[in-house]
A protein has these predicted regions:
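Conserved beta-alpha junction segments in alpha/beta enzyme cores
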Residues: 63-67, 72-77, 198-228
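Bacterial N-terminal signal peptides that target proteins for export
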Residues: 2-14
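Bacterial N-terminal signal peptides
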Residues: 13-23
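Structural recognition of the beta-strand scaffold that forms the well-ordered cores
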Residues: 135-139, 172-174, 181-182, 222-224, ...
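Sec-dependent signal peptide cleavage junction
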Residues: 21-35
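Conserved, well-ordered active-site substructure
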Residues: 147-167, 209-262, 272-324
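A substrate-binding/cap region within the structured catalytic cores of diverse enzymes
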Residues: 166-210
Length: 331
């Protein structure tokens, strides 16, 4: 009899929990999603898997291929919607160190030594120095392989490290003091910039694709902005057929243009191309792509996406991770 009463109470508890869950707002249980990506010209979308990093920030792992199915591309896209509680931070090895303060880092900025470190370790150093929650990290600008100096703009916490290395004339991605983002030509006044990192050239400028004609298939990396202020980062793995053959620059341009990006710059690709994320419900930043060297490479600068959300201790939503979350067209 006691066993029967216990079983009845257990079932009553389970039913009560289920009924409570049905009363929770649907959006509290739903993962962020973005629209299915538009493939680059001449490519088809094979699959797309979306992961929420925080509300308004979505990681999309995609596979593209030719219609013949003989040139697969593995891509990693992060979409940061306007109003998302996150911001970008430029990073360079040795700037963010444990125990440093904004004041000490400002003093250090004028004499920062050129050196290299992995993207994920730069993110870890940022967290040690500031306590910030890095939810996405990617490598940044080209650099001089002898001196390790980045070629273009580098601004961190409003501290101008350099506008260029005396030779390059690179455009730059910027976080402005009002919290908005911009991609600007070299030479444009940067007094209103908090964070900046350069890329060697434009992929899209003022809504116009910048095709190069370069036929090389390579790992590619980039960042762009849509007309509504949405920021898109995209990395394509390469040199690893049949897993991922890579992209030409023009294919990368075509892909970004199809997503509605109006301004975009190229970032360092090849073996340096790195994309790491911390998915909602997890505690560690993990490299999601497969660097073509087989391991994560040390790089000069990096770009970190940091959550600015503050916990108030109140339940907001549950993070659900079903086993099958893949979008496959026409399935």
């Amino acid at each position: 009899m006691k066993a029967t009463r216990f079983a009845n109470r257990a079932w009553a508890f389970v039913l009560a929990v289920l009924m409570t869950l049905t009363l929770i707002a649907p959006q509290a249980l739903a993962a962020n999603t973005v629209d299915p990506v538009e493939p680059a010209s001449g490519k088809i979308l094979v699959s797309q898997t979306d992961y929420t990093l925080i509300d308004g920030v979505t990681e999309s792992n995609i596979f593209l291929n030719t219609k013949e199915g003989n040139a697969q591309i593995a891509g990693f896209m992060t979409t940061i919607a306007p109003g998302a509680k996150a911001t970008f931070k430029a990073s360079y090895n040795g700037y963010y160190t444990e125990g440093s303060t904004p004041a000490s880092r400002k003093d250090k900025a004028a004499n920062l030594a050129w050196s290299m470190e992995k993207t994920t370790l730069q993110a870890a150093n940022y967290t040690k120095a500031t306590g910030g929650n890095v939810i996405m990290a990617m490598n940044g600008d080209y650099y001089n392989m002898q001196t390790l100096q980045p070629l273009g703009y580098l601004i961190m916490e409003g501290n101008l490290i350099q506008k260029n290395n005396g030779v390059a004339n690179e455009p730059y991605f910027a976080v402005l003091k009002d919290g908005t983002y911009a991609i600007r030509d070299a030479g444009v006044d940067c007094s209103d910039v908090l964070e900046a990192i350069s890329g060697p050239f434009y992929l899209i400028k003022d809504g116009q694709p910048c095709y190069s004609g370069n036929p090389d298939l390579m790992p590619r990396n980039c960042i762009g902005i849509k007309a509504d202020g949405t920021v898109v980062t995209f990395l394509a793995d390469g040199r690893q057929s049949p897993y991922s053959v890579g992209m030409t620059i023009d294919e990368e341009v075509s892909f970004l243009y199809a997503q509605g990006v109006v301004n975009a710059i190229f970032l360092d690709g090849g073996g340096s191309a790195t994309c790491a994320t911390k998915r909602e419900g997890t505690t560690e930043l993990q490299v999601r792509n497969r660097p073509s060297d087989g391991v994560e490479r040390t790089v000069a600068s990096a770009l970190l996406l940091v959550s600015t959300a503050e916990s108030d201790g109140v339940f907001d939503h549950a993070s659900l991770s079903p086993n099958n979350t893949v979008y496959t067209p026409n399935s």
